[in-house]
C-alpha cells in the first residue's frame, strides 16, 4: 500500500531488487540491496510512483530540478538566458506528492510563506544510470516521463537569493513536488515538443511549447552526468515556462502536457 506521497507502508525488504527497481542494477546497487535485507533499527520510507499500465512501481532516488530553462521565464526572473549555463538543485524525495490520474488532490499551503508559486514542468525518469553521458546516448537513459509541479515559496527564495545564501528553503519542503504516475517511454516516445500549460481556477497562467526549452532533456542529462553519476530512480524536473505566479487556499491548479493525462491539485 502507498499513501499520497508515494511511501511504501509495508516492509522495505526486497524493494531494491523487485518491480521497477530492476531497471538497471550496478554491482554497487546489488551490494546495497543485500545490505538492505539486513535488520535495521527503524524503517525508512521508500518513495515510489506507480507505473501506468503495470503493477510495477518506480522507486525515486533523487529529485533533480533545472532552474530557468525557458528563455521567457529566465528573463522574468532577472537572468540572461543567452549567457548563463544550466544550473540544478534538488528536492528531497519526500517532497513528492503523488497525484493520481483523474483526481484533484488536496495540496497543503506550506508554512513560512505569503507568496506561494506554481511552476509546471515535464519530468523525465531515469532507468539506466551513467557518468559523463554523451548527447547521442542521453535519451537511452530515460525510462519514462510524467508531469509535475515545482511548488515554490517565492518570498523565501527571493530573500535568500538577495542575501547570497542557498535558497533551498524556498524549493525543498514537504509536498513541494506534486507529480503524476510514470509513463513508460516505450509507450509515449520522447517529448521534444508539444504544448505545456497550467491553469488556475480554469484560467490560463502558463502556456508554452516544450521546444522552447533552452536546454533539452537530453542536454540536461549530459550536464547532470558531468557533475553527478546518474542512477536508476533519478527524476529530472526539466524547467518551467514563463508566467509563474501565486496561488492561495481554495485555488485549483490544472496542468497539461500534450500526450500525458492532466494533473490537478487544490490548495488547502
Regions found by a protein language model. Give the residues of each.
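N-terminal secretory signal peptides and thylakoid transit peptides that target proteins
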Residues: 1-18
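Hydrophobic h-region of N-terminal signal peptides that target proteins for export
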Residues: 20-25
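Extended, compositionally biased flexible segments
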Residues: 34-132, 137
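Catalytic-pocket segment enriched in acidic/His residues
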Residues: 34-57, 73, 100-103, 154-268
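A generic structural signal for short beta-strands and their flanking turns/coil linkers
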Residues: 83-85, 92, 118-122, 141-147, ...
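Short, structured patches in soluble enzyme cores that scaffold and shape functional sites
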Residues: 91, 122, 126-128, 146-151, ...
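Hydrophobic, well-structured mid-protein blocks that either form specific transmembrane helices
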Residues: 132-169
Amino acid at each position: 500500500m502507498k499513501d499520497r506521497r508515494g511511501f511504501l507502508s509495508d516492509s522495505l525488504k526486497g524493494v531494491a531488487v523487485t518491480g521497477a527497481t530492476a531497471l538497471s542494477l550496478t554491482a554497487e546497487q546489488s551490494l546495497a540491496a543485500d545490505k538492505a535485507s539486513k535488520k535495521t533499527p527503524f524503517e525508512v520510507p521508500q518513495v515510489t510512483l506507480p507505473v501506468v499500465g503495470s503493477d510495477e512501481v518506480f522507486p525515486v532516488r533523487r529529485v533533480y530540478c533545472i532552474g530557468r530553462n525557458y528563455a521567457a521565464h529566465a528573463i522574468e526572473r532577472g537572468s540572461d538566458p543567452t549567457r548563463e549555463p544550466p544550473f540544478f538543485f534538488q528536492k528531497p524525495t519526500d517532497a513528492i506528492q503523488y497525484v493520481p490520474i483523474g483526481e484533484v488532490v488536496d495540496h497543503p499551503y506550506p508554512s513560512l510563506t505569503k507568496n506561494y508559486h506554481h511552476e509546471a514542468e515535464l519530468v523525465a525518469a531515469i532507468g539506466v544510470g551513467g557518468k559523463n553521458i554523451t548527447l547521442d546516448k542521453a535519451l537511452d537513459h530515460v525510462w519514462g516521463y510524467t508531469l509535475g509541479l515545482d511548488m515554490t515559496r517565492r518570498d523565501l527564495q527571493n530573500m535568500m537569493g538577495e542575501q547570497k545564501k542557498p535558497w533551498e528553503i524556498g524549493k525543498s519542503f514537504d509536498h513541494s513536488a506534486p507529480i503524476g504516475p510514470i509513463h513508460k517511454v516505450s509507450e509515449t516516445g520522447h517529448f521534444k515538443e508539444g504544448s505545456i500549460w497550467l491553469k488556475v481556477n480554469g484560467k490560463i497562467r502558463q502556456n508554452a511549447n516544450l521546444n522552447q526549452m533552452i536546454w533539452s532533456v537530453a542536454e540536461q542529462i549530459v550536464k547532470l552526468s558531468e557533475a553527478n553519476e546518474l542512477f536508476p530512480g533519478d527524476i529530472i524536473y526539466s524547467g518551467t515556462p514563463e508566467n509563474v505566479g501565486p496561488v492561495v487556499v481554495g485555488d485549483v491548479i490544472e496542468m497539461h502536457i500534450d500526450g500525458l493525462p492532466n494533473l490537478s491539485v487544490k490548495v488547502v
